[in-house]
């Protein structure tokens, strides 16, 4: 499995907008039901920091891509304008997990 973690800080006056766009991504994912990855997003307690985690599954023959989801494309298109601290993506190693 390949994991990617993306961290950034939204502008305080655009954090709710950012969350709304993320919620549209999840609505689109729910409607499309793509296969081959797990996607989680966290809004941290400071209200402006977000962490996205994408885990690509190895056991899917023809995995779908988050990049192909229209709502995700719309989310990514304006991310720079919504951020005080630009997104930083890093590969991550899964050490363990529970449920």
Where are these regions (language model features)?
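Short beta-strand micro-motifs enriched in acidic
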Residues: 42-44
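Short, low-order "capping/linker" segments at domain edges
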Residues: 92-99
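Short hydrophobic/aromatic beta-strand element in the GNAT-like acyltransferase core
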Residues: 3, 38-39
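Residue-level preference for beta-strand/loop junctions
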Residues: 2, 33, 46-48
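An amphipathic, aromatic/His-enriched active-site/gating alpha helix that lines ligand/cofactor pockets
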Residues: 24, 28-38, 55-90
């Amino acid at each position: 499995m390949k994991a990617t973690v993306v961290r950034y800080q939204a502008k305080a006056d655009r954090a709710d907008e950012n969350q709304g766009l993320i919620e549209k991504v999840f609505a689109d994912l729910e409607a499309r039901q793509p296969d081959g990855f797990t996607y989680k997003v966290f809004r941290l307690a400071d209200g402006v920091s977000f962490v996205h985690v994408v885990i690509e599954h190895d056991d899917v023959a023809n995995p779908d891509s988050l990049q192909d989801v229209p709502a995700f494309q719309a989310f990514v298109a304006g991310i720079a304008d919504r951020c005080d601290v630009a997104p930083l993506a890093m590969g991550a190693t899964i050490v363990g997990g529970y449920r």
